[in-house]
C-alpha cells in the first residue's frame, strides 16, 4: 500500500528550502529516537544530475548544521540515494519518478510499464498494450526497474 508523504515532518520542514534550491528531492525521512539521541536517515534524489559522493558529503555538512541548530537532541545523520530497484513508498514519489519504468503490483502479479503522469490521488500507468489510471490506494507494491 502506498502512503501519503508527511510534509509536517520537522526535519523535512527544516531542510526543504536548502534541498529545493539545489534541485534535490527528499524521498524519505526516517527518524529513530530514544531518550537523548537518535538517528536520522534521509533518502535524496535529483532528476537533473547524479548525487555523487562529493555532492552528498557537502550536502551532509549543510544539513547537519541546520539540524544541529534546531533539534534539541543528539543524533547521527545518514544521507543516501534511492538505488536502482527502489520500492516506491509514497504518493509523492510517483510525481518525482514520472517517466520512469516501474514494476507495479495491483492484484497478485507484477506488470512492467511507465509512470506517464502523477495526479493527487492517482497516476497514469502505460504498458505496451494499454494506459490506465491507477489509484494509489489500489497499489499493493511498486518499484523502479
Curated annotation (Swiss-Prot):
Gene Ontology annotations for the cellular component aspect, listed alphabetically: cytosol
Location(s), subcellular: Cytoplasm
Keyword tRNA processing in annotation: no
Sorted UniProt keywords: Cytoplasm, Ribosome biogenesis
Protein name as it appears in the record: Ribosome maturation factor RimP
Domain of life: Bacteria
Entry-linked HAMAP family: RimP
Function text: Required for maturation of 30S ribosomal subunits.
PANTHER family per record: RIBOSOME MATURATION FACTOR RIMP
GO terms of biological process kind: ribosomal small subunit assembly; translation
Primary location group: cytoplasm
Family in the record: Belongs to the RimP family.
Pfam (any one): RimP_N
GN (gene name): rimP
SUPFAM superfamilies in the record: YhbC-like, N-terminal domain
Amino acid at each position: 500500500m502506498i502512503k501519503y508523504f508527511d510534509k509536517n515532518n520537522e526535519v523535512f520542514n527544516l531542510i526543504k528550502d536548502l534541498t529545493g534550491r539545489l534541485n534535490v528531492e527528499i524521498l524519505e525521512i526516517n527518524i529513530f529516537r530514544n531518550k537523548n539521541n537518535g538517528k536520522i536517515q534521509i533518502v535524496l534524489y535529483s532528476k537533473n544530475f547524479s548525487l555523487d559522493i562529493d555532492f552528498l558529503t557537502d550536502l551532509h555538512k549543510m544539513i547537519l548544521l541546520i539540524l544541529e541548530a534546531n533539534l534539541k537532541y543528539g543524533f547521527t545523520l545518514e544521507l543516501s540515494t534511492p538505488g536502482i530497484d527502489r520500492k516506491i513508498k509514497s504518493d509523492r514519489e510517483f510525481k518525482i519518478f514520472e517517466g520512469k519504468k516501474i514494476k507495479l503490483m495491483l492484484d497478485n502479479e507484477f506488470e512492467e510499464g511507465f509512470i506517464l503522469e502523477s495526479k493527487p490521488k492517482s497516476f497514469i500507468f502505460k504498458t505496451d498494450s494499454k494506459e490506465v489510471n491507477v489509484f494509489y490506494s489500489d497499489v499493493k507494491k511498486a518499484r523502479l526497474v
